[in-house]
Every structure is written in structure tokens, then in C-alpha cells.
Regions:
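Phosphate/Mg2+-binding loops and adjacent switch elements
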Residues: 1-21
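Short acidic/glycine-rich loop or secondary-structure boundary segments that cap or lie
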Residues: 42, 57-60
Length: 124
């Protein structure tokens, strides 16, 4: 029950681990076991970042860096930056027309971003 209460009020894994370590409810071995298992689970996660609607690569990199920093600090994980999707008004048009963007506008920067992402994910 104490763990459930902690989970409701704590916002980061780092905070949660600190509460477990300082809790008087658990013995030392249990504290160590819970903390090491949670850290191992967090490190096993391999989240990926794709920044959407960025104006350029520089803006996307800044956003990805900020997100990655918070993921490291609060979740103890290191996300991989896969790239970005550049903002383009024609995305809405093509969605409404029912035609794939990369077919309608293959030379647009957004189409190149989609191809780059597909390549990084192993689809090409």
C-alpha cells in the first residue's frame, strides 16, 4: 500500500527511488532489490524521439535535447533521437485529399523527413 501511495504523488523515477531508499517500511535488502530492479527496467527501455512540426533541423535538435535531458533526469533513460518532421501546411491538404503526402509531394522537405525516418527504422 505504501508503494501505491508513493506512485500517486511522485513525478519522477528518481524521486520514487529516493523515497524507497529512505522508507522505514522496507528492510535494506528489499530497498536495494526494488531500486536495482526499477533502474534495470528503466535502462532496458529504448524510447525514440521524433520531433513533429519543427521549422528546421536546429529547432528539432534543441527540442530533442530538452526532452532527452528530462528523460535522463526524471526517468533515468536515454532516448534515441530519430529525427524530425518539418512543419508544412500541405500536410493538412494531403490528409484531406486522401493521397499520401510522399506521393503528392515527393520533393518536399517533409517527404524527405518521412523517408529518413523510415530508413532509420529499417523500412528502406
Amino acid at each position: 500500500p505504501e508503494l501505491a501511495l508513493l506512485l500517486k504523488r511522485i513525478e519522477s523515477l528518481r524521486e520514487f527511488l529516493e523515497c524507497v531508499k529512505t522508507s522505514s517500511t522496507f528492510d535494506g535488502e528489499t530497498k536495494e532489490s526494488v531500486c536495482s530492479e526499477l533502474v534495470a527496467l528503466a535502462r532496458a527501455m529504448k524510447p525514440k524521439i521524433v520531433v513533429n512540426r519543427a521549422r528546421n533541423a536546429y529547432e528539432a535538435q534543441i527540442a530533442a535535447n530538452i526532452f532527452a535531458k528530462h528523460a535522463r533526469q526524471n526517468l533515468l533513460i536515454e532516448p534515441e533521437n530519430l529525427g524530425y518532421m518539418v512543419f508544412d501546411n500541405r500536410v493538412s491538404e494531403t490528409i484531406n485529399s486522401g493521397m499520401p503526402l510522399v506521393v503528392s509531394y515527393p520533393k518536399l522537405k517533409i517527404s524527405q523527413c518521412i523517408a529518413d525516418l523510415a530508413s532509420r527504422l529499417g523500412y528502406f
